[in-house]
Amino acid sequence: MSASSQSRPTTIACLLGPTASGKTAAALALAARRPIEIVSVDSALVYRDMDIGTAKPSREERASVPHHLIDIIDPADAYSAAEFRADTLRLIGEIVARGRTPLLAGGTMLYYKALTQGLNDLPGADPEVRAALDADAARDGWPALHARLAQVDPDTAARLAPNDSQRIQRALEIFMLSGQPMSALLAAPRRTDDAAAAYRFVPVALEPSDRAVLHTRIAQRFDAMLDAGFIDEVERLRRRDDLHPDLPSMRCVGYRQAWEYLDGDTDYRTMRDKGIFATRQLCKRQITWLRAMPERIVVDCIAPDATARALDALERVLDGRTPD
């Protein structure tokens, strides 16, 4: 029997919630009370030079408490759930070794699931295969590749739109590298390891009792991003010439809509409306993920004292005052 199975797992508090739910305020409130280091659970914050559209913590906020997994890769590159899992487990160990407390905070539920439930044995990205698929798509179009996917993996193809280039490419890549449909690999038992077994992850979920209030916040937040120069930020990224709208970074909510606007495909008002709608759809998916976690501790994120409630819940987790 391993040492990790003999000893009691270390409790790790996880502050999860949809966009605009107040995660940053709650995390900073905890930082004022305890020696924490924040590990971001956000697939958009990993990218450098994408500050406004991702609502990245300010320099002052990041100076007041150590943050990790922010600004770690270039927008031209990809960052997988497997990389997040490995990096997070390493960081947790390092933070604990320093005598400090890790706090996981974010809203990318796929990352959290990979961390806490393990990974499927999917092959990694292959630049040559992706280049070949990109060339095929440039010649024949993504709907043709979607039809190709339907022949080898009908289950995956059935849930993807014909122009969902990123996911179609990944599903075809997996089949070409493994010889098996992605749907079959995802249905296989997940791989776990002793590194994750050493921890007990306890989610504190910021959820709205009235989704309309959160929708209003989302609209206000998107308008504030536009006022802060979001379009200029996307324009600077476009001038690099090595980015395109099918990259994971440029598919982030808001960036895709701004790119379409700068391409002349939509007007400003339509871009704004589509950006707000896409953010609300993301929020809906995040809440659905959260509600599938029966072990979560729920805090109403639109309550007047939401930050204080979240702080109390996090401290109860860290003090061991929660059921096992």
Swiss-Prot record:
The record marks 108, 130 as: Interaction with substrate tRNA. Its EC number is 2.5.1.75. It comes from Burkholderia cenocepacia (strain HI2424). InterPro entries: Dimethylallyltransferase (IPR039657), IPT (IPR018022), P-loop_NTPase (IPR027417). GO terms for molecular function: ATP binding; tRNA dimethylallyltransferase activity. The keyword Nucleotide-binding applies. Keywords: ATP-binding, Magnesium, Nucleotide-binding, Transferase, tRNA processing. Monomer. Pfam families: IPPT. Transmembrane segments: none annotated. Catalyzes the transfer of a dimethylallyl group onto the adenine at position 37 in tRNAs that read codons beginning with uridine, leading to the formation of N6-(dimethylallyl)adenosine (i(6)A). It catalyses: adenosine(37) in tRNA + dimethylallyl diphosphate = N(6)-dimethylallyladenosine(37) in tRNA + diphosphate. Substrate binds at residues 19-24. This is tRNA dimethylallyltransferase. Belongs to the IPP transferase family. One of its GO terms (biological process) is tRNA modification. ATP binds at residues 17-24. Its cofactor is Mg(2+). Residues 42-45, 166-170, 251-256, 284-291 are annotated as: Interaction with substrate tRNA. It is an enzyme of class 2 (transferase).
